[in-house]
Amino acid sequence: MYFQNIDALIFSKLLDTLLNIFFLLFFLVLGAEFTLYIINVYFPNLLLYGNALGIKFVLSILGSLIAFPIGLVFQNNYKNFLNYINNFTVDIFFTSLLSIIGALFIANLYFSFLDISSILKEFLFIKYLLRLLIQTILCYSGFILVTFHSDYLLNILVPEMAEAIFSYNKIVRPSITRVLHTSYIINHNIIAIFQSQFVEGLVLIPKSTIQELQILNNSKNFKDKYLGRLGFSRLNELKYNYFDQIILESSLTNCHENVLFKYNKTYNNEQQNIVLMSSCSNNIKESNISQLLISNLFPLIININKLIELLKLPYLSGESFYLQIVRKGKRLGQGIGYLEDGTMVIVNAGSKYIGQKIKVIVKKVWQKSTGKILFTQPIKNS
């Protein structure tokens, strides 16, 4: 399934590139043809002086150059429109289509008045411009109206279809692309959670997450450096074992390129993930384990007992384990070590074991929303 998602992204990028080329070529040809049409209709004598073929060639190139920026503007607006309607549910899309058809029907009724009106018979340009203006206003107004009241209108017009569409939206849902937070990568449960297949769909690693890990890795603080290296190690393990599910932001194909390159300068790392996911037209599901928001990352229908088993404390009071003492603590005689997930372990009378791996027993656990600290003491004859 994930291979199919990646193939779909690659095909979408290829199709998007071909469509961009088509738009640009279309406007280049349109600009050249429109310029030649203006010359032939309004300035026919211009071709009588000099080389007619050369004049047409130069003017067509000039028309193409003028039409080129117009094509770029149209191309950008078309991409924005596609990303906007990609978020539509079936009911909104159906009612929007009906509103546009109804708006065009009402506009045609009004156009019949314009056709018989003697006032505008001599002003054809104003007549056609008025046609375009009325069509645009009615279509846009109907489109905006049903976007906010699609459920109500669909229940009135086609109640049977409204019920079927409601069931479709509730049952048939596309997999959600999730953002992997930095603190989530360095958490010791991340590998186990992937192994238990709680995470469905694609998982996106933003550039901000890589940058945060790099900052930690380059830090002079021992704990930060340890967490940075641990994060890169776990990220590499995830990419190796779940390469069909993990996607780096740089390889993403269906987002706004302008957003991806510009948002780093205006948002912090938390806001960048939100802008990134909204630009990819996906529901935002982001979590920070240290803030106990694990419920926002996964679907509601999950094995709660298994999730609790994964998220429980690694060691409880009275349990023992081996620990590498890496430095002195703040108080006299204390030694400091770290678990695999970066949890600080304070060892009473452990400063003399710096650089050694000893067996300790847990005396007390401090659990807070920001993390946990284990208080231990060495086991004699360990």
Curated annotation (Swiss-Prot):
<keyword id="KW-0934">Plastid</keyword>
<dbReference type="InterPro" id="IPR002716">
    <property type="entry name" value="PIN_dom"/>
</dbReference>
<dbReference type="GO" id="GO:0009507">
    <property type="term" value="C:chloroplast"/>
</dbReference>
<protein>
    <recommendedName>
        <fullName>Uncharacterized protein ycf81</fullName>
    </recommendedName>
</protein>
<comment type="similarity">
    <text>Belongs to the ycf81 family.</text>
</comment>
<feature type="domain" description="TRAM">
    <location>
        <begin position="314"/>
        <end position="375"/>
    </location>
</feature>
<dbReference type="InterPro" id="IPR002792">
    <property type="entry name" value="TRAM_dom"/>
</dbReference>
<keyword id="KW-0150">Chloroplast</keyword>
